[in-house]
């Protein structure tokens, strides 16, 4: 953040990144591994499979974008069966802590500034993926300082207690 703030002010003495970050997008988050992915990208792959206790086919490219906070992801999901997009969106609307911002006619879609200070996850740009059968695309945004591992752990713990899953 210090480098970004200094670049806004025209200073360039503090360089956390090898390149200017102001008005830039850097596809390099964490160290590169032998497989060409970064540690952060592999963390996304491994944590997703760990959470779902499966071997979901997943890939990721992590990009550093100069915003003061927030994580954004473009997600492509392939389902086993055909689906009705409106039914899927209705189902997503029922998830606690998930807010749909998906009205492209009025230019409403998730952006990092919506998420600032919120525990909600914002989802939009929900559409069928024409490149792959039974697939959809969506854009997801959350405040990484609020909706990270700690908040998720608290929410999961509350759910476990509420459903009497532990003594």
Q: Where are each of the predicted segments found?
A:
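Active-site-lining helix/loop region of Rossmann-like oxidoreductase modules
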Residues: 1-91
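C-terminal active-site/capping subdomain that shapes the small-molecule cofactor and substrate pocket
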Residues: 56-167
